[in-house]
């Protein structure tokens, strides 16, 4: 099982742990719904796709926030904002690279 989510749904996805989960893939996580994210301490892989110019949690800020998380990669989509208008292909490519 791969757990995925976008924006606040990404926050919910990162709050879930279960033995059936193989990895997490999130797009534009805001990291503001909860004070603690269960996935942060989990050794299974996490990929957080971030917009460089996200209005709610810019990529640089997100990278700092998850620096201590286990087995976590942040993929930055340059030129994109929280809604990834015109940058959807970059999301598809990032997810494809993770799943390849």
Where does each model-flagged region fall?
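Active-site nucleophile loop of the alpha/beta-hydrolase fold
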Residues: 6, 25-35, 51-53
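Hydrolases whose catalytic domains are alpha/beta-hydrolase-1, hotdog thioesterase
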Residues: 12-16, 35
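Short beta-strand/loop motif that positions the catalytic acidic residue
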Residues: 42-43, 47-50, 54
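Short alpha-helix in the alpha/beta-hydrolase fold that links the catalytic acid
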Residues: 57-67
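Catalytic histidine neighborhood in serine/cysteine hydrolases
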Residues: 67-83
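Post-His helix in hydrolase/transferase enzymes
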Residues: 85-99
């Amino acid at each position: 099982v791969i757990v995925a989510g976008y924006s606040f749904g990404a926050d919910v996805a990162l709050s879930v742990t279960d033995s059936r989960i193989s990895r997490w893939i999130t797009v534009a996580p805001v990291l503001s719904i909860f004070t603690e994210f269960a996935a942060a301490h989990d050794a299974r892989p996490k990929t957080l796709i971030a917009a460089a110019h996200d209005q709610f949690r810019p990529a640089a800020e997100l990278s700092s926030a998850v620096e201590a998380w286990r087995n976590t990669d942040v993929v930055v989509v340059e030129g994109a904002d929280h809604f990834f208008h015109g940058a959807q292909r970059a999301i598809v490519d990032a997810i494809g690279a993770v799943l390849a």
